[in-house]
Amino acid sequence: YAIVRATLGSVSLDVGARHEDIEGEVQNYITGETVERSQSLTSPSVSAIWELSDTMSVFGGVYEGFSPAGPGSDASNEESTNYELGVRFSHEATEASLVGFFSDYGNLIGRCRVSDTTCEPGSEFNGGEVEISGVELSLNHAIALSDTLSLEGSLAYTYTESEFATTFLSGFPQWGLVKEGDELPYIPESVGNARLSLVGDRWRIEGSVDFQSQMREVPGVADIEDALHSDGFAVLDLSATYALTKNLSLQASLLNVTDEAAVVSHRPFGARPNRPRSVVGRIRYAF
């Protein structure tokens, strides 16, 4: 890959390209057949940052995405054009960013896993044109309570929308019959995390909440509860860490404090729950 950067005043522009030559081969030991496939692709990208002030900047970019189909596959390559536009703030102990994103897929690939019972593992399927868009928000802030004690907080949230742009019948079990405008499965609308930490010289006490909205497990546009779906959930975790030395630390965690129970997936073999309330101890050594 290669990147060229140009700077004019408070604006920086990066123009890049990545080139890949892919040689693939698949052997069928039952039939003795060997299939070879050669692919070459160049993916360009362009991004820019505009420093509005010492604390505020605006950034954006356009990037070509690519995921090759396997050498023995009848599926087309996965290709996409990805856009982002955002604003970033940083001042002393505060950092924040807001980013909008949009991914325009010319073709989406679905890949059969070993756990999928109605397709051959490794087989690939065309999903046609797909659009995925959303907004990401992040916020970090720290307050010095004393020379040796601080309070740190963070918040991260992602909102995502998705839809198929064509109607088709697929042998991929996660898709099946897809109608134009259907939302994609396994892309939750809302995902987030909130974290609060009390930090001393050699110790840290932290509480965090991970949350996720209900999630489709089959394509559709009707009420999500009218079809196969996973539950929404909010899980509280607590942890305490103590540094014995610069490299060695001990940590105790109470995960899923409230013992929240939720079905997180119905595939591959029926409903699966999240982790129940658990106590975990760790010894960490950093090299």
Locations of regions flagged by a protein language model:
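Structural signature of Gram-negative outer-membrane beta-barrels, strongest in the C-terminal barrel
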Residues: 1-105, 197, 245
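Membrane-embedded beta-strand positions of outer-membrane beta-barrel proteins
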Residues: 4, 15, 46, 60, ...
